[in-house]
Amino acid sequence: MQVLVRDNNVDQALKALKKKMQREGIFREMKLRRHYEKPSERKAREAAEAVRRARKMERKRLEREGF
């Protein structure tokens, strides 16, 4: 991953790098890989995340439709 540093503005480049890493999900992946996760735990976590996403999408859909 590359970020351009313009006019020696390192702070702005770091901010852009953090934003890119956040968008790519690198911080989340680093957090998950700090410790070993058993395959069964991974499946349970992914299933819970899928349920959470489905509920969120349903709430958004109902909010848009006005029910």
From Swiss-Prot:
List the keywords (alphabetical). Answer: Ribonucleoprotein, Ribosomal protein
**Coiled-coil region list:** none
Q: What's any one GO cellular component for it?
A: ribonucleoprotein complex
Q: Which regions are flagged for Basic and acidic residues bias?
A: 37-52
Top-level lineage group: Bacteria
Q: Name one GO molecular function term.
A: structural constituent of ribosome
Q: Does the keyword Ribosomal protein apply?
A: yes
List GO BP terms, alphabetically: translation
Annotated InterPro entries: Ribosomal_bS21, Ribosomal_bS21_CS, Ribosomal_bS21_sf
List every stretch annotated Disordered: 37-67
Zinc keyword on record: no
Cite the NCBIfam families for this sequence. Answer: S21p
User: What PANTHER family does the annotation carry?
Assistant: MITOCHONDRIAL 28S RIBOSOMAL PROTEIN S21, SMALL RIBOSOMAL SUBUNIT PROTEIN BS21M
Q: Family assignment?
A: Belongs to the bacterial ribosomal protein bS21 family.
Q: Which HAMAP family match?
A: Ribosomal_bS21
Record protein name field: Small ribosomal subunit protein bS21
Where does this protein come from, organism-wise? Gluconacetobacter diazotrophicus (strain ATCC 49037 / DSM 5601 / CCUG 37298 / CIP 103539 / LMG 7603 / PAl5)
